[in-house]
């Protein structure tokens, strides 16, 4: 279980937490639970899904994780998200799959019942774009520079960072697409599916978008994420639905 603040610098154009930011939190809380049940082995996220029901949030958001399945090779976790500031209203549902990695020298046991109080708001917070090293721009390609603080214990880019890159890249792509009527007005990502294919280690990492077309509830964008510093290898593939207000 984890609480996520809904501060101004974390919000999208519609008035809710960025879908990519929410997936970052989900990756953390779900991954922590998966890490507990996979001990003494380690885990790495292989896929994340998000279905957003309520798009405007008061906060804090409560993320509650439940193990759906623990196997030898993977752990599947359900994360349910509610808005404590809106009387516990349902916000989103996510399913994540983590691959189990054998450790040559197991880390110390991960404790259960750990409590970390939510930190108070920063007086001068850094925007999501700046914190995650996402370069300004528009069009079908969005770039992220990997900072050391964005790496996990395996030395690779956090899955949440790739989710946020996919979110912002998809919104930029829809806004710049001349075949849609959503160039103006508020947009946000609502539904996301992210499959992690290989580790991103060097960077820069690019989200390369293809606008697949419109459906009644929004525009679907495919985001291919590549590590330009390692033979332009594809490291993730995402499908993102971008919706107007």
What are these regions (language model features)?
Residues 3-5, 9, 51, 97-99, ...:
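Generic structural detector for well-ordered beta-strands
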């Amino acid at each position: 279980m984890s609480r996520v603040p809904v501060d101004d610098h974390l919000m999208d154009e519609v008035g809710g937490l960025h879908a990519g930011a929410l997936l970052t939190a989900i990756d953390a809380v779900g991954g922590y639970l998966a890490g507990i049940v996979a001990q003494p082995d380690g885990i790495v996220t292989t896929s994340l899904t998000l279905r957003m029901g309520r798009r405007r949030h008061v906060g804090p958001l409560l993320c509650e994780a439940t193990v759906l399945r623990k196997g030898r090779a993977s752990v599947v976790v359900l994360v349910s998200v509610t808005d404590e500031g809106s009387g516990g209203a349902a916000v989103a549902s996510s399913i994540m799959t983590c691959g189990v990695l054998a450790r040559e020298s197991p880390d110390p046991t991960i404790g259960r019942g750990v409590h970390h109080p939510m930190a108070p708001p920063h007086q001068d917070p850094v925007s999501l774009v700046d914190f995650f090293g996402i370069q300004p721009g528009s069009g079908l390609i969005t770039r992220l520079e990997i900072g050391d603080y964005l790496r996990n214990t395996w030395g690779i880019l956090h899955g949440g960072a790739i989710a946020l890159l996919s979110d912002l890249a998809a919104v930029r792509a829809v806004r710049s697409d001349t075949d849609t009527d959503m160039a103006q007005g508020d947009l946000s990502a609502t539904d996301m599916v992210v499959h992690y294919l290989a580790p991103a280690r060097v960077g820069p990492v690019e989200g390369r978008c293809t606008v697949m077309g419109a459906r009644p509830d929004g525009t679907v964008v495919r985001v291919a994420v590549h590590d330009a510093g390692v033979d332009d290898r594809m490291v993730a593939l995402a499908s993102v639905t971008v919706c107007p207000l």
